[in-house]
Amino acid sequence: MKTGIGQPVRRKEDARLVVGAGRFSDDVDLPRQTRAFVLRSCHAHARIKSITTERAKALKGVLAVLTGADLKADGVKPIPPDASTTMPYEAQRRLPDVVLVHRDGPLMQTPYYPLAVDKVRYVGEGVALVVAETLAIAKDAAELVDIDYEALAPATDTALAAEAKAPRVWDEAPSNIFLDAEVGDAATTDKAFADAAHVVKLETWVQRVTGVPMEARTAVGNYDKPSGRYFLHAGSGGVVRQKGELASILGVKPEDVRVVAYDIGGNFGTKNSIFAEFPLVLWASKRVGRPVKFVCERSEAFLSDYQGRDLVAKVELALDKRGHFLAMRGSHLSNIGGYSSSIVPLRKGVSIFSGVYRVPVAHYKAYAVVSNTMPTIPYRSAGRPEAMFIMERLCDLAALKTGIDRIEIRRRNLVAPEQLPYRTPFGVTYDNGNYEEAMNRSMAMADWEEFRKRRADSKKKGKLRGIGLANYIELTMGYPREWSQVKVLPGGEVEVAVGTLSSGQGHETSFAQCVSEWLGVPFESIRLVQGDTDIIPVGGGSHSGRSMRMAGVCMGNAANGVIERSRQIAAHMLKVEPDDVEFSAGSFKARGSGRAVGIFEVARAAQELNDLDDALRGPLAAESDVSFTAGGYPYGCAVCEVEIDPQTGALEVVRYCAIDDV
């Protein structure tokens, strides 16, 4: 089909988005809506001695000034961490990741209330919520809130926070070390290092970052008193998970919460975890009896959006005299911030520590440390880029140490196609790939062999020129369960409902191409349904390269279900046996005759024919609900070439080439 899988088509989303007809969170306004403003901590670490709100409440137009004490009094519960900190050991073993077991038993859970209660643990943590008729009034009222802090020494540096003498982020904890785990074979690894001809070492810090999506986080919440239901419209990475989390925080049944998100202006992982303002606007709406809207400003987003990376690594690589890798050992120290929101980046990075290279034995120590910083969560590949950076730097250091060309030392140690499936020392199994071919093709695209000439030309201009190469592998999985429903409507439209949620990935287009090919229906006839928990019962959202991989399977299963049910209805219509009905290009044909019915005719018959079996009557739809256990291992290679002006330090990326096998 010209609009099927792999065909170049115009994106379905763009016709709506380029004319400003998208429906983002800030486009939503409800009748009698109020505005909320969060007063945030100016301290990284401090006890809250008192909060005085009387002057703020007296300001005309102020409807409520709420604190952590009010929140606890109303029974609002902490924001739950992701499953990485709470999942039982046996459940973790069923996933493709390395299991990190804390040496001192179960992990301590750090209650993360939507507003700080007794103590603030990072700059930007919410301390009070002001609800007013307008945002300007709410901001003015926030300036009238008096907070008496007892400032405490903060622990912000990742390495220093892990030291025994560091200020305690949590008074009840013996140290700031939240997780202390190790994986691999220490004795065998140490012997390999003792016998090695060469050892290279790397100590590095991968800095903290945040996502900065084009659409800042926004939440519009409403409590409907007659039904007792909460409604939230907020851009996120997946509405179903957030529905469950909100129900947990508010202490209600999941069916009493509806979460909606239509167009999402970027994510990068920062929107996959629930933000404090999401339960706050719902709770505040119940308190004031009106809808409440919160819109995060860019300046406060830098303080209070979830953040990523922040990893201190100390790693060694052992080699024999011919440059073959013998072993790796080291430690990863992940700064998870003031609360134990996630250890996924640490776990993922350790899982694929060796990249696409053969490393016979290894031993790693993995630490997570709490600090007086914004919590970190899975962000843009969650720990894997850090691991790839570390491994590729070790390759370059090994080349310098041994005198072997940096490309040749990689070739000698790449996992070869005939060695796949390949099991790493930590038990992760790469299923397939051709890593050397990806490297070769990237180098060819980058014209690697002619680099010396280009560098000489730059030198004549007084410029420096450099080129670098990095091989990489991913481990995609994320939330392991996904769902889809495919429904063929008599009027010539196909509805495809999914539990994923696009934030710019183009699901309306790519998913429609898949279903168009499978059902043989026009690309234009397919409508994607997503982002509404009253319609979508199951789904993990979009993260970790899971959307097409998981939703594609579910959509394919559901499409097959529609075809098989349609075959039986078509057999009834054509007066033949189901085995004598062939399906092709959207039509069901009676074998050996010219008689046929289209899939939309079948959909109409399913609802109109009275002599159909009860099992075949009704809307022509099928569902698929699948739990996945196997990870995916996309891989590739990137080459970057830069030119630098040594007088000014100005850097220009003059060439970038990459091969990515998904």
State the predicted function of each range:
Residues 131-132, 276-282, 313-324:
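Active-site-proximal alpha-helical scaffold in enzymes
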Residues 165-250, 414-493:
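Helix-loop-helix junctions that connect adjacent transmembrane helices in secondary transporters/permeases
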Residues 35-48, 126-132, 380, 391, ...:
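Short, well-ordered beta-strand elements within core beta-sheets of diverse protein domains
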Residues 1-178, 199-202, 277, 287:
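Flexible, low-hydrophobicity surface segments
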Residues 77-83, 93-95, 252-305, 345, ...:
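Active-site rim segments in enzyme catalytic domains, especially the processed small/beta chain
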Residues 405-413:
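Short, well-structured alpha-helical segments that form the helix of a local strand-helix-strand
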Residues 2, 73, 103-105, 110-113, ...:
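Gly/Pro-rich active-site capping loops and adjacent beta-alpha segments
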